[in-house]
Amino acid sequence: RVMKTCKEMGIKTVAIYSEADKNTPFVKFADEAICVGPPPSSESYLLGDKILQICKDLNVDGVHPGYGFLSENADFTRKATDAGITFIGPSPKSMELMGNKLAAKETVKKYGIPMVEGVDEAIVDVEKSLIKAKEIGFPILVKAAAGGGGKGMRVVEKAEEFVEQMNLAISEAESSFGDGSVFIERYVGSPRHIEIQVLADTHGNTVHLFERECSIQRRHQKVIEEAPSVILTP
């Protein structure tokens, strides 16, 4: 969708891809496509410095991160900005506050907004965190602190599965975002996922697009967004 809009506006597009994605539609649709590395994301889509060097070599004006990988990485955003490349997304400061779920929880807590019971810091000792998980009560949701796209998230139904699922979540978060930090929360089954989307540009114009019903998901990733939500009152 981003490239389609760019083409309608007469803006040339460049796609980066791993060897595994060389025949995908977005690669063929772009005006130019550059292979950034082999299939593992740690050797391709997470190589921020390499991606920025490609931008410089091709005189790219702006970079759109898509979702997952480096899309919520404040360090990458700052490096792009410092290199004179427009990052199409939040500022590094905003990303530091909200791109990391633990930092976001800390920010939200200051406003007295209710949150699901859980821990507010990255887990460094898996065995000790099992004690906390038992206090919260199963099922437990293990969540990667960085990134999005449903990566690094595991539902743990019982204590016997906790250590294994924690280690799997840490490994997935590390390979997907380059950051293996995870935390735990009480798992809420069949919740309503409601978002209010806010858009702002560099000129200070801000608009909200009302609420969106995002409860239909697959692997903790939204499949359909419906606006307005049919369950909320005006």
Question: Can you describe what each PLM-predicted range is?
Answer:
Residues 1-234:
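N-terminal beta-alpha lobe that positions the nucleotide/phosphoryl donor
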